[in-house]
From Swiss-Prot:
The record marks S103, C105 as: Important for catalytic activity. The gene is colC. Its EC number is 1.1.1.356. This is GDP-L-colitose synthase. Substrate binds at K184, W199, R206. GO terms for biological process: 'de novo' GDP-L-fucose biosynthetic process. It comes from Yersinia pseudotuberculosis. The lineage of its organism: Bacteria, Pseudomonadati, Pseudomonadota, Gammaproteobacteria, Enterobacterales. Pathway: Nucleotide-sugar metabolism; GDP-L-colitose biosynthesis. GO terms for molecular function: GDP-L-fucose synthase activity; isomerase activity; NADP+ binding; oxidoreductase activity, acting on the CH-OH group of donors, NAD or NADP as acceptor.
């Protein structure tokens, strides 16, 4: 099977390609220069030339709360354009199977736990990443519409919880929470800081899955695509407080300082726990526990840092 993987240079893409099962398939992994997803005619030409059997859409403009608040236009427009362009070009080229990666930010902000796939578009979105969420919802809905118009097409959406792991961005201003905290605590250790600041009161809860597990789910899905639901949550079914994540990371890195809370800072949704019922029925569950995943991620960061 020939698979086009968009976003091959990102964390999810790199984890897919590093997975032991990747060698069983022929992957096409264009960079954004080789395949500009903001230009539909480029995509059409590329698909006609390479003729993939299956597409995994993992490309996107991503970032943590800082980046989403500061760049709402970019997060909405570019993510939406990439999704619409790729999906419609794939349909035009008669590519029958496509796995679209969504995000748990697609869910309403007031539905804090037990988020089921049918809750999409049932309430107001969290304002701090609304643009990104709208783009992801648009792609998921477009997948549904394409299938509805022609049942020969199977365009489906996986909705992972928050991710972390190897190949992530470790930048306090533009990264997701876990890599940002790892970098923050490593810096505190190196500079002898006795305190580390946490945004908010530390009681907001988040569900984070090791990205290697998502790659494992994707290979399971490729082999069981017909029985995969239209939209499916992919997560642990368990969450932790922000403070608990800080404590686990501090323990692994050996940081002995204290945490202080800046309650004037935004924290996003208070809770965002997805429901794993359909995932369990589909027959997949995650393999890597939180402490093991964070330990591997810390080691990856330190290795990369020492090699710079």
């Amino acid at each position: 099977m020939k698979i086009l993987l968009t976003g091959a240079g990102g964390m999810v893409g790199k984890n897919i390609l590093a997975h032991t099962k990747s060698k069983d398939y022929e992957f096409i992994t264009p960079s954004s220069k080789e395949l500009d997803l903001l230009e539909k005619k480029h995509i059409t030409t590329y698909l006609k030339h390479h003729k993939p059997n299956f597409i995994i859409h993992a490309a996107g403009i991503v970032g943590g709360i800082h980046a989403n608040i500061n760049n709402p236009v970019k997060f909405l427009v570019e993510n939406m354009q990439m999704g619409i362009n790729l999906l419609t070009a794939a349909k035009d080229n008669n590519i029958r199977k496509l796995l679209n990666l969504g995000s748990s930010c697609m869910y309403p902000k007031d539905c804090d736990s037990g988020l089921t796939e049918d809750m999409i578009l049932t309430g107001e979105l969290e304002s701090t990443n609304e643009g990104y969420a709208l783009a992801k919802i648009t792609s998921a809905k477009l997948c549904e519409y394409i299938n509805r118009e022609d049942s020969e097409f199977q365009y489906k959406t996986a909705i992972p919880c928050n991710l972390y792991g190897k190949y992530d961005k470790f930048d306090e201003n533009n990264s997701h929470m876990i890599p940002a905290v790892i970098k923050k605590i490593v810096t505190a250790i190196e500079t002898g800081k006795s305190e580390v600041e946490i945004w908010g009161d530390g009681e907001a809860r988040r569900e984070f899955m090791y990205a290697e597990d998502l790659a494992d789910f994707i290979f399971y899905t490729i082999n069981n695509f017909t029985k995969m639901p239209q939209n499916i949550n992919v997560g642990l079914g368990q969450d932790y407080t922000i403070t608990e994540y800080y404590k686990v990371i501090a323990k692994i890195l050996g940081y002995k300082g204290t945490f202080v809370y800046d309650k004037s800072k935004p924290v996003g949704m208070r809770r965002k726990l997805i429901d794993n019922t359909l995932l369990s029925e589909f027959g997949w569950s995650n393999k890597v526990d939180l402490e093991s995943g964070i330990s591997k991620t810390c080691q990856y960061f330190l290795n990369e840092k020492n090699n710079d």
